[in-house]
Curated annotation (Swiss-Prot):
Gene Ontology biological process terms from the UniProt entry: translation
Organism placement in taxonomy: Bacteria, Bacillati, Mycoplasmatota, Mollicutes, Mycoplasmataceae
Source organism of this protein record: Mycoplasma mycoides subsp. mycoides SC (strain CCUG 32753 / NCTC 10114 / PG1)
Protein name: Large ribosomal subunit protein bL9
General function of this protein: Binds to the 23S rRNA.
Source superkingdom: Bacteria
Keywords: Ribonucleoprotein, Ribosomal protein, RNA-binding, rRNA-binding
Family: Belongs to the bacterial ribosomal protein bL9 family.
Pfam family, one: Ribosomal_L9_C
Gene3D superfamilies: Ribosomal protein L9, C-terminal domain (3.10.430.100), Ribosomal protein L9, N-terminal domain (3.40.5.10)
Length: 153
């Protein structure tokens, strides 16, 4: 009997796989447990259409992720840190970066997506690596300017 697997079945087949199995095994175990459905011409065509639609969705999502990467790599985020006698006060956290991306550029990224992030406390240009979907990584440029802390002396 030709069947379409609805779920992964160990040592038998994977989800959406079309396979020939014995009639008894299909009727007595696979069908009652809703692990498979009988493969008819109509169900095979429906499966192919479904897989094609899933593939198109995946391609669209990947293209959108690449566009986000391009956008992220083109921007420069600007921050200011107070300094006094070449000492930097404070730092820039991943949450600060996420907030600026969200508020100013309308890009939402989870702060857990930053790779090997340490708070930024250096004046000048810094780079932060972000892991997006589909294994795509982007570098965000961060420009940190210094603001002299007023000295009462």
């Amino acid at each position: 009997m030709k069947v379409i697997f609805l779920k992964d079945v160990p040592n038998q087949g994977k989800k959406n796989e079309i396979k020939e199995v014995s009639d008894g095994y299909a009727r007595n175990y696979l069908l009652p447990n809703q692990l498979v459905k009988i493969a008819t011409n109509n169900s095979i065509q429906t499966l192919k259409d479904h897989l094609k639609a899933d593939q198109e969705e995946k391609e669209l999502a990947k293209a959108q992720t690449k566009q986000i990467k391009k956008t992220l790599e083109e921007l420069t985020l600007h921050f200011k840190l107070q300094t006094n006698d070449d000492k930097v006060f404070g730092s820039i956290s991943s949450q600060d970066i996420v907030n600026q991306l969200k508020d100013v550029h309308r890009i939402e990224i989870d702060k857990k997506k930053f790779i090997h992030f340490k708070n930024i406390n250096k004046i000048g240009i810094n780079y932060v690596k972000v892991k997006l979907d589909f294994g795509i990584e982007a570098l965000i440029k961060i420009d940190v300017k210094e603001v002299q802390k007023w000295n009462k002396n």
